[in-house]
Amino acid sequence: MIEDMYEEKNPLGYFDNIRMDVISFIDKPAGEVLEIGCGAGGTLSYLKSNGLAQHVVGIDIASSQIEVALRQGVDEAFVSNLDDLEEILHGRTFDAILMLDVLEHLVDPWSVLKRISGFLRPGGRAYVSLPNVQSVRVLVPLLMGQWRYKELGILDKTHLRFFTKRTAVELLRGAGFELESVHHKLESHTLPRLINFLTLGVFKRYLTVQYILVGRI
C-alpha cells in the first residue's frame, strides 16, 4: 500500500523538516492554517509558536506522523489520503493552506488543487512547493540516458507527476488561483549559486531544485 511506502521514509528524516524557506514568505499572521502533508507537524508548530497562526490543522497519510504532530502542539491532525477531505473538514475554511512537496505525489494534482481552493477564505493564500524537473540534477543524467528513481529528491520513487516552472504556474492558475509570486530554491552548493550570480540568472531554471509558489483566491 502507498501508506506503507511513506511510513518507510520516516527513518530518512522525510517528515521532520521545518520549512523555513516557505515560512519566510508568510508576511503576516494568519488566523487558521491548514497543512496538507504536514508530516510531524514541525512547520505548523513553528507558525503557531511564533505568532504566525492562531489555530493550526494538519493532514497526512502517515498515521505515525499525525501522532507526533499532535504531541508537538498542532491543534488538530487527521490521517487521510485526501479522498475524504470534505468529510474531515466539514465545510471549514482557512486563511492559509500549505501543500509542500505534496502535489507531485498525486495521480491528479490538478483536480485536487481545485478542491483545495474551496477550503480557502476570500483573500486566503495557498503556499505550494514543487520540485523542478528541469534541474541540472535531472537533465545531465537524462542526456546520458539515465532516469533513476531515488529515495529522496526530485526523482523520489513516490513522485507521480513532474513540473517545470511553467507547468507549475499553469497548475495554480488552472485551479483558480491568482499567482502572487514564484520563488526559486537554488542548489545549496556554492558553485551553482556562483554560476547563477555570474550569468545574471540566465541559467536559473536549470540551477533551481524547487519552486515555491504563492497563490491567492
Regions found by a protein language model. Name each.
Residues 1-92, 96, 110-113, 130, ...:
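Conserved N-terminal segment of class I S-adenosyl-L-methionine
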Residues 4, 144-154, 194-197:
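Short glycine/proline- and charge-enriched loop/turn segments
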Residues 96-102:
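A short beta-strand submotif of the Rossmann-like class I SAM-dependent methyltransferase core
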Residues 106-107, 130, 134:
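A structural helix-start
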Residues 107-111, 138:
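Short N-terminal helix/helix-N-cap motif within the alpha/beta-hydrolase-1
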Residues 111-122:
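A short glycine-rich, Lys/Arg-flanked "PGG" loop and its adjoining helix->strand segment in the class I
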Residues 124-130:
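Conserved beta-strand signature within the Rossmann-like core of class I S-adenosyl-L-methionine
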Residues 150-167:
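Acceptor-substrate binding/catalytic loop of class I
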